[in-house]
């Protein structure tokens, strides 16, 4: 996304996703992610410290960390039962981002690319197919609560990880890592050379 021309970056910002263009953290720290997943209370949407401090996690936090919309209608994922009207391929999305002029197809390609790679990744290289279909079949201009969707999806991923022990945690664990690394939370969590100390 760094190589996109300014008019495309402006269109992404106008959609409410400008924060993704400025993400500073692009590498996951697996020891920290493992600790976050073990300490996360899905039922109450909070991170529980050993010091009995609980840090709530809300869609507003997702908006502040990732710079995506946290208002509007809820995202409803439609399960397609017929043949899809497109191919699920990240390379096609990358080509669309590079080659298409700013317009509805460009914006849909960006949304799907962002969700397949950053906001709602799963163990497949191309993300959740039903989300592709939902975005392709909807209007881009409708304001949606993408932050709430991201939080629900990563919480569902944590739940699946705990119950079925897959090798991959689906969802935006990058959000959780950046969230706990913010100055506001560093007073609660001190991270030093992959060891976690509670202040």
Where are these regions (language model features)?
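N-terminal leader regions that mediate targeting or early regulatory function
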Residues: 1-104
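Long, internal protein-protein interaction and assembly surfaces
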Residues: 71-73, 85-199
């Amino acid at each position: 996304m760094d190589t996109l021309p300014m008019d495309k970056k402006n269109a992404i910002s106008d959609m409410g996703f400008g924060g993704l263009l400025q993400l500073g953290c692009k590498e996951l720290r697996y020891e920290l992610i493992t600790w976050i997943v073990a300490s996360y209370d899905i039922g109450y949407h909070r991170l529980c410290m050993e010091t009995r401090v609980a840090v709530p996690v809300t869609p507003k936090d997702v908006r502040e960390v990732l710079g995506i919309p946290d208002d509007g209608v809820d995202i409803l994922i439609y399960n397609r039962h017929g043949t899809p009207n497109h191919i699920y391929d990240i390379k096609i999305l990358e080509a669309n981002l590079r080659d298409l002029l700013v317009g509805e197809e460009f914006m849909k390609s960006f949304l799907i690319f962002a969700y397949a790679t950053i906001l709602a990744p799963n163990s497949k290289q191309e993300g959740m197919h039903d989300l592709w279909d939902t975005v392709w079949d909807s209007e881009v201009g409708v304001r949606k609560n993408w932050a709430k969707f991201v939080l629900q999806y990563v919480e569902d991923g944590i739940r699946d990880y705990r119950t079925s022990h897959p090798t991959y945690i689906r969802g935006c664990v990058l959000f959780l890592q950046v969230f706990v690394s913010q100055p506001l939370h560093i007073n609660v969590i001190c991270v030093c050379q992959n060891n976690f100390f509670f202040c």
